[in-house]
Design a protein with these regions (language model features):
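PRPP-associated nucleotide enzymes
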Residues: 1-223
């Protein structure tokens, strides 16, 4: 939660720093930065402050009564919650080049079919997606929000590129590699966005402010 602290690290501060790192590695020209509420807002504010690009609310949450839309086990329930809780502000979106920050891309289904669609439907000129965490490669071993490797957006991309399942996609973990770039471009095309750039894992660790050996990195590295 934004007002929480873990191991002495402010959640909101870490989110803003993640957004700032995204901005420092970016060179996109845009009219404004926006966040997918609620968890993407802190990242977007950090991006806006670091880049000098103004922050605007392209999407607003209908009510704080809706919970995290990616956690229900059934896809139809996840889609329903996501549809009901987000409203697009057309007067802000129409005709503009938008950088949209979210906390992560898990499956990519809600981002593609709901969030991105709402932005295009309301007249976005360009959509540049900036997830404030690295590509998720492995299901979480502590929660049930993701249960299988195959449901993750990155693994769907790898399966499409390789024509088969890969047990440990080591070549795709290196964000400097050609295979990593092809994976990101596959996801970009699948999402139907102008550009897609993830936060690098080293930048995420630096933004959090704790040593890597004190963080669980299983979702990204598988260890």
């Amino acid at each position: 939660y934004p007002s929480s602290s873990y191991e002495g690290i402010s959640v909101e501060g870490a989110r803003e720093r993640c957004g700032a790192y995204l901005a420092k590695r970016d060179n996109i020209q845009a009219d404004f930065v926006s966040g997918v509420p609620d968890s993407g807002v802190g990242h977007a504010l950090g991006y806006a402050m670091a880049s000098g690009i103004p922050y605007r609310r392209a999407l607003v949450k209908y009510t704080p009564g809706y919970g995290r839309s990616y956690t229900p086990p059934a896809q139809e329930i996840r889609d329903l919650v996501a549809t009901m809780k987000l409203c697009a502000v057309r007067v802000v979106i129409n005709g503009n080049r938008i950088i949209i920050c979210d906390d992560s891309i898990v499956r990519g289904t809600q981002l593609k079919n709901l969030t991105i669609k709402k932005l295009w439907d309301n007249g976005a000129k360009e959509i540049h997606v900036r997830p404030a965490c690295p590509p998720l490669m492995f299901p979480c071993i502590y929660t049930s929000s993701t249960r299988t490797t195959g449901e993750l957006a990155c693994r769907k991309a790898i399966r499409a590129l390789e024509g088969k399942e890969i047990e440990h996609p080591s070549e795709y973990l290196d964000h400097h590699s050609e295979k990593h770039a092809k994976m990101i471009d596959w996801i970009r095309r699948d999402l139907n966005v102008t550009s897609l750039k993830y936060l690098a894992i080293d930048d995420m660790i630096a933004a959090i402010g704790l040593p890597a050996d004190q963080l669980c990195l299983h979702c990204w590295l598988g260890k």
